[in-house]
Amino acid sequence: MVDRNLLHYIVVTGILIKNGKFLIVKRADWEKAFPGKWTLPGGKLEVLDYVLRQKDTSDHWYNVFEDLLKREILEEVGLEIKGGNFDYVASMVYIRPDKIPCLIVNLSIEIPDDEQNVRLCPALTDFAWADLEEAKNHDLIEGIYEELEILDKKLKTGKVLEWGK
């Protein structure tokens, strides 16, 4: 029997940075969690995200978060992430309205200023490339603004900070 105390969804979100601005997206009003709020692209890890792939060692799959985030970014906002290194920003746990706990890991990546255009999936209704000041004008899910602050300070000073209000 599985111990429900040990079960969590694992969610990876991404802060995409282009020309010093962050990509934020608005959730559809019909979404179960945080309807109509502004957030970051990302999604849940599923077993099929790795088990159909060849293992990287005899026992393990590597880069699972990175591969998941690349797929979710392509599905949700139509941007293809080619190569690149994701950086860790923050992690948190959230209990959804349906009582399922979610471990959320937030990563960031700078993307080139190329010809790719954002194309939203049906679960998202709007997007913005926003700097910190512009992000204040959007109804962000609580805590996301602080994640953007952490990343902004890291980009400007090289200092890595922990999340805090």
List the predicted regions and their residue ranges.
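Conserved Nudix-box catalytic region and its N-terminal flanking loop in Nudix hydrolases
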Residues: 21-75
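Active-site-adjacent beta-strand/loop module that shapes the phosphate/pyrophosphate-binding cleft
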Residues: 84, 90-117, 151-154
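NUDIX/MutT-family hydrolases
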Residues: 108, 118-149
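Short secondary-structure junctions
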Residues: 77-84
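Conserved beta-strand and immediately adjacent loop positions that scaffold enzyme active sites
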Residues: 13, 21, 126
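Charged phosphate-binding loop/patch that engages nucleotide di/tri-phosphates or the phosphate backbone
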Residues: 145-165
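Acidic, metal-coordinating catalytic segment for phosphate/diphosphate chemistry
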Residues: 1-13, 30-31
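A cytosolic small-molecule/anion-sensing beta-strand core signal
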Residues: 18
